[in-house]
Amino acid sequence: MNLLFRLLPAGMSRDGFTCGNKALDAYWRTQAGQDQKRGFATVVIASDAQTPDKIIGFYTLAAASVLLTDIPEAEARRMPRYPAVPAIRLGRLAVASTLQGQHIGSLLVLDALRRSCSNELAWAIFLVDAKEERSVTFYEKFLFKRFAQRPLSLWMHRKQAERIVKLMAKSI
């Protein structure tokens, strides 16, 4: 399967996609287009290049911040003493229920990191909001770390994201 990643086009039908998670399915059907249109999130879709109108997965990115006090001291020591650190948040990620277990979720995460690292927007931390413990385990495979205070929230320093993107580019 040759995946095509692109921004959710305005007016694109969102019928036919389900990931099996009621909250994510509802977001996809009712909110994704509005969030992108109103500037609350960038919605990136994945489809097979042969059938570009059939969505097989999506994710959202948004500007965010994290309190410096939430970052472990070893990392925070190397950052400016601003109260909040600029971040990018991977808020939602979903794969069609019929295609789960085929590493499409991993490709969505890698595309989100690549897209974020190639952006001229300044950010230091990449945030992920996992929906359940099983998802936390998935993100930890990419070397995301848990926040001590919020066990379903994870983070990665930009330099780590850039290393992953660089390794990914070499393997292609």
Question: Which role fits each region the language model picked out?
Answer:
Residues 145, 150-162:
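Active-site/acyl-donor-binding loops of N-acyltransferases
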